[in-house]
């Protein structure tokens, strides 16, 4: 598994439906980039200029919404993950 550093977070991307309600299969070019996922790993937090470590506000297991083009996409063991900074997360969904 990936271990993020600092204020970085590893997100498991939530897949969207590939067909419409009417049964039409969407080609790859018609799909929107996902903006939600599940937190699977968090870093230790950012360090301030005074040397104080500030813990992250999100936790493993949180369902989050993030900026559309944020982070770096990686594949590990066939699973898609996104590594992004805490500041790229817009909200935690309940």
From Swiss-Prot:
SUPFAM superfamilies named among the record's database cross-references: GroES-like
UniProt GO BP: chaperone cofactor-dependent protein refolding
GO molecular function, one term: protein-folding chaperone binding
Localization: Cytoplasm
A cellular component term, taken from the record's GO annotations: cytoplasm
CDD domains linked: cpn10
Keyword Glycoprotein: no
Transmembrane segments: none
Cystine connections: none
PROSITE patterns: CHAPERONINS_CPN10
Keywords for this protein: Chaperone, Cytoplasm
InterPro entries: Chaperonin_GroES, Chaperonin_GroES_sf, Chaprnonin_Cpn10_CS, GroES-like_sf
Pfam hit, one: Cpn10
Function summary: Together with the chaperonin GroEL, plays an essential role in assisting protein folding. The GroEL-GroES system forms a nano-cage that allows encapsulation of the non-native substrate proteins and provides a physical environment optimized to promote and accelerate protein folding. GroES binds to the apical surface of the GroEL ring, thereby capping the opening of the GroEL channel.
Family: Belongs to the GroES chaperonin family.
Subunit field text: Heptamer of 7 subunits arranged in a ring. Interacts with the chaperonin GroEL.
Name of this protein: Co-chaperonin GroES
Organism: Exiguobacterium sibiricum (strain DSM 17290 / CCUG 55495 / CIP 109462 / JCM 13490 / 255-15)
Gene that encodes the chain: groES
């Amino acid at each position: 598994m990936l271990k993020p550093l600092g204020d970085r977070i590893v997100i498991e991307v939530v897949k969207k439906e590939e067909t419409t309600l009417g049964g039409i299969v969407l080609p790859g070019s018609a799909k929107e980039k996902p903006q939600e996922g599940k937190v699977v790993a968090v870093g230790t937090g950012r360090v301030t200029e005074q040397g104080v470590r500030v813990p992250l506000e999100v936790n493993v297991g949180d369902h989050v919404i993030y900026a559309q083009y944020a982070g770096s996409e990686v594949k590990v063991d066939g699973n898609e993950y996104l590594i992004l900074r805490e500041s790229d997360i817009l909200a935690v969904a309940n």
